[in-house]
Design a protein with these regions (language model features):
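Short, well-ordered alpha-helical
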Residues: 2-7, 13-97, 144-158
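Catalytic domains of carbohydrate-active enzymes, especially glycoside hydrolases
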Residues: 49-63, 122-139
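Hydrophobic faces of well-ordered beta-strands that scaffold small-molecule active sites
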Residues: 32-40, 58-62, 85-93, 138-142, ...
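Short glycine-enriched loops at secondary-structure junctions
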Residues: 38-44, 87-97, 137-147, 187-193, ...
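Preference for extracellular/luminal or secreted protein segments
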Residues: 1-54, 262-263, 272, 292-580
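Second-shell residues forming the walls of enzyme active-site clefts
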Residues: 27, 69-83, 95-97, 162-337
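Active-site mouth loops of central-metabolism enzymes
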Residues: 34-45, 108-122, 203-217, 287-294
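Active-site-adjacent structural elements in enzyme catalytic domains
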Residues: 67-84, 117-133, 343, 347, ...
């Protein structure tokens, strides 16, 4: 039986009665539907009505759209749902995770470089304000992973640090910021990512710490969040073999499952030992870390039977709903397990006051609330974060400051993620970099890029020959005073590790020029690029590819303000030459 008066619900008798009455009045289909958080592309009100009638979902996690479109969507969903919906958002960096016009404040890695936890608080504050203005009420954040392995790129920018103490301080501040708005938080990805280099989107993730080391790091962090009243926990498709073996002596290797399907991790450890009473939700169910471990018909009900309360997304909603319902009818999900899940789901809704707000017609704020999105106050917080966090990783050749009055002629070598679509027309971030360098007083010559040449001139061997041609060294030195190597590399769920990739083989983009003229490397995202360009002796982590981040980084490089961010040793990737 779930204690709804205890943390994190703190319900009074009236709210508990609403939970009990609601469950008592549900059909089996409605109970099954509450277990799902779905993402459906519903374009009209009729589409939304049909989705709700078919699946009776407990929650919504949407993807994309500007603030007005998201506000309309959330308003329409809530207006047509029998029960108030949990509407979830991913806001790792601020309000930009909730809508396309939201405010980017900083990445978690950027916040970890700050002198205090104020940046982490501001990320949560702005994320909560802007997301709640659209009607969202559930923050799928903070990311509580610990960045222990520099090769791990899936949490490189999303982790608040490489040790438990730094992460605990920052995620506590983030949650405090979010809680200034009517939103619940969700720590992810239990039992913890960042230990190995692989990505649970693509393979079974493995946290291979010993039980003792896990308890001293991830365990201590999760216990701190639970003690603080954390409302929900997202479970990663990540195995913890040492913990499973400790809790299930004799378990065979082939029986070790991701935490989403491991009752010893969810029920024995998280619920009973750690005392977590809040909602437990799976990570996205299309990820390989779960999808490749069991047949879909088994995995869907097994996740709930193992201890999850909610199931995130569906492969085919009709099919997954049928799998879940059959799991209930066949007893895979026991009546007690289903009851506990429903009590926690509805308990979270009551904790947020959604039942009262539904009755009052205030589940979604009026459209005027969208004035908070991208407001001057939030833009100022983004500028503050950039000013306090952008980090000079190294300047061993004492190239800084770069003075555009004396070193005016700049060569820009811009490296971007490899295009994945025929619709590619160039990276707009490069244009921003050029504009900001020119604003600072530089004249800018942009180095060729193979992908752009292929678009502009059509596929040709001449394009490769152009890219391989470095020209005469004497002419290069006579033409340029400084080179800016700017890296705008991002990746998601296509490869386990995302590394710097030059636009073609034997490319003239390679940093041979670092020995010819002063060269400054700037990363606009990942913090571990020195593994691929150790020969660049001046390197800056700017953390973001927004105009604010780019402008502030350039101003610091030019000596207009001091670098205030602090890098951890993970930026050097365990190599001696990256420090040179």
């Amino acid at each position: 039986m779930v204690d709804l008066k205890a943390k994190p619900f703190y319900l009074d008798d009236e709210a508990i009665q609403w939970v009990e009455n609601t469950i008592a009045g549900m059909t089996l289909d409605e109970k099954v539907g509450q277990l799902f958080v779905l993402m459906r592309r519903a374009r009209t009100e009729d589409d939304i009505k049909n989705v709700l009638a078919d699946y009776h979902q407990g929650g919504l996690r949407y993807q994309g759209g500007d603030s007005k479109a998201v506000h309309w969507q959330n308003t329409t969903y809530q207006a047509n749902s029998k029960l108030p919906l949990l509407i979830a958002v991913n806001c790792d960096n601020g309000g930009d995770g909730a809508m396309s016009d939201g405010t980017f404040i900083a990445t978690a890695a950027e916040a970890a470089a700050a002198p205090d936890t104020q940046t982490a608080y501001n990320i949560g504050l702005v994320a909560g304000r802007e997301a709640s203005a659209t009607g969202a009420n559930w923050m799928f954040n903070p990311c509580c992973d610990i960045y222990m392995n520099w090769r791990n790129t899936i949490v490189n920018t999303r982790s608040f640090g490489d040790n438990a103490d730094t992460v605990i301080k920052n995620i506590t501040a983030f949650i405090d910021g979010v809680h200034q708005s009517p939103m619940a938080c969700c720590c992810k990805h239990f039992p913890g990512d960042g230990v190995e280099e692989r990505d649970q989107h693509l393979v079974l993730g493995v946290n291979d710490l010993s039980a003792g080391d896990w308890e001293a790091s991830f365990g201590r962090m999760y216990r701190t969040m639970i003690d603080g009243g954390l409302e929900s926990m997202m479970i990663g498709h990540i195995a913890a073999p040492a913990l499973s073996r400790k809790l299930r002596p004799g378990i065979r290797d082939e029986e070790i499952m991701p935490a989403t399907l491991a009752p010893e991790l969810l029920t024995d450890l998280l619920r009973q030992d750690m005392g977590f009473n809040g909602v437990i939700i799976t990570d996205a169910s299309h990820m390989a870390g779960i999808a490749c471990m069991e047949k879909r018909s088994v995995a869907v009900p097994k996740a709930i039977a193992s201890g999850c309360d909610m199931f995130l997304f569906a492969n085919d909603a009709d099919e997954d709903f049928a799998y879940m319902k059959k799991g209930v009818e066949d007893g895979v999900i026991t009546p007690e397990r289903l009851s506990d899940a429903l009590h926690r789901i509805l308990g979270l809704k009551a904790h947020l006051g959604l039942h009262k707000r539904q009755a009052a017609g205030t589940l979604v704020p009026p459209e005027e609330a969208l004035s908070a999105v991208g407001c001057a106050e939030h833009r100022a917080l983004a500028e503050k974060a950039a000013e306090e966090c952008i980090t000079l990783v190294k300047d061993t050749q004492k190239n800084l400051p770069i003075d555009p009055a004396r070193q005016k002629r700049a060569r820009l070598v811009f490296i971007q993620s490899t295009p994945t679509s025929k619709a590619y027309k160039g990276d707009p971030v490069r244009d921003v970099v050029v504009e900001e360098l020119e604003r600072a007083g530089f004249t800018v010559s942009v180095a060729p890029n193979f992908h752009d040449l292929e678009v502009e001139k059509g596929p040709s061997m001449e394009n490769m020959m152009t890219m391989m041609d470095c020209g005469k060294m004497e002419e290069f030195r006579a033409s340029y005073d400084v080179v800016f190597l700017v890296l705008n590399i991002k990746g998601y769920a296509q490869e386990n590790n995302v590394r710097l990739r030059w636009s073609c083989n034997h490319s003239s983009e390679l940093p041979w020029y670092a020995t010819e003229v002063p060269t400054v490397g700037i990363s606009l995202n990942y913090t571990n690029h020195l593994i691929d360009v150790p020969q660049v002796r001046t390197f800056v982590n700017a953390y973001g590819n927004t105009r604010t981040s780019i402008r502030t980084a350039i101003e610091k490089i030019c000596g207009k303000s001091e670098f205030c961010g602090t890098a951890s040793d993970t930026v050097f990737c365990g190599k001696w030459d990256t420090r040179l």
